[in-house]
């Protein structure tokens, strides 16, 4: 987690619901709820890494696949926030 929070070149996208992020987020993460990802696609940049996180890694795996299908460099944070 410390590596993820200290690297300013990475984009951490927290896709959890509003009520879920009230318990805390990774430092530097941007909150974009899962269902609004398509509306925010224009803000993502090609060839930059995006690390997608949710509560347990299930929803983030789906969003990671969606972003990859649209040619973005996306990575699932396995285990999600529960892993931290």
Regions found by a protein language model. Name each.
Residues 1-11, 17-49, 58-84:
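Rhodanese-like catalytic fold shared by cysteine-dependent sulfurtransferases
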Residues 53:
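Short, surface-exposed ligand- or partner-binding patches at beta-edge/loop junctions that are enriched
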């Amino acid at each position: 987690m410390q590596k993820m929070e200290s690297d300013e070149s990475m984009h951490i996208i927290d896709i959890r619901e509003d009520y879920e992020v009230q318990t805390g987020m990774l430092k530097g993460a941007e909150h974009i709820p899962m269902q609004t990802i398509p509306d925010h696609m224009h803000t993502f940049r090609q060839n930059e890494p995006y690390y997608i996180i949710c509560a347990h890694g299930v929803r983030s795996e789906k969003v990671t696949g969606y972003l990859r299908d649209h040619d973005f460099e996306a990575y699932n944070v396995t285990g999600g926030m529960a892993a931290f």
